[in-house]
Amino acid sequence: MIRLDGGVFAMGAEGFYPEEAPVRRVRVDAFRIDETPVTNAQFARFVAATGHVTFAEVPPDPKDYPGMPPELAQAGSLVFDPPPGPVDPASLAWWSFRFGATWQTPLGPGSTLEGLEDHPVVHVSHSDAAAYAAWAGKALPSEAEFEFAARGRLEGADYAWGDVFEPGGRPQANYWQGPFPHGNTLEDGWLRTSPVRSFPPNGYGLHDLIGNVWEWTDDWFALPRIEKKRPGHCCIPANPRGASRAASMDRKGPSGKTPRKVLKGGSHLCAESYCRRYRPAARYAQPIDTTTGHVGFRCVVRG
């Protein structure tokens, strides 16, 4: 783990996605953070020690999903399945719910972790990540802690490495190159996840805070807001946290009454033509009961 002394920084961004705005000054206290996302090898040690069964390994209870056909009540997870050609981005046609896809079988039955030991663990829910953190004597980061760490001392820069997207024409993280979702040119060498530390560290010596996998935080999702100044109170919030569990729900959206946590960092599926979220300020609302092949996590220790 690497210790960060904390401090005041400008959180958020303007000019990209509305859920990132406004830019606001916040303060975080000192904390330590994992140098990389938790790897398959590390997660395997946790499972061996505790017998933990992940969310994706448990068949859904039909009572929790009214109207679901019984034949679909099988364990599994969402796997990226690139289409042969262009598709409507709103269709999300590149995702397949694959029975038997788990952290140990990331592409479904017949796949293994051979050669992926030092890749980030995926197909883990928020509860799986929190269970690992508790076992390790750690915690999941807040959104503010994650963004502070991801910025690596570059105050106000668009990217974790500066304001130039690809310095010298070289990818600085594992993200999608080419037309998404059907034409990855593999300029960074990876179609899916990559081994941690495959790309240069940021200014704090941290790896993979941008790209590779989205990472769970422990904050409920909400749109940012600026607190009104109150007499006798400092105008810079300290250690801000997200919304309430209830407020994180998008009752009119596809996730319905399922609470949502904030994901940070972007992933190998973020593309300039589709999802420019390979930036410290980027954020995404992920239902806590949804697991995919591009979401992982890392841990912090506060104080």
Predicted regions and their residues:
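An anion-binding catalytic pocket shared by soluble metabolic enzymes
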Residues: 34
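Short capping motifs at secondary-structure boundaries
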Residues: 31, 46-55, 136
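Short, structured beta-strand segments at or near domain termini in extracellular proteins/domains
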Residues: 293-303
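Acidic-aromatic/histidine active-site loop/patch
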Residues: 39
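C-terminal, low-complexity/hydrophilic appendages and adjacent surface loops
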Residues: 18-21
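A short N-terminal beta-strand-loop micro-motif at the entrance of redox/enzyme domains
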Residues: 25-31
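Functional-site microenvironments in short loops/helix caps that host divalent-cation chemistry
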Residues: 3-4, 10, 15, 59-280
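Zinc-dependent metalloendopeptidases
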Residues: 26, 45, 57, 114-115
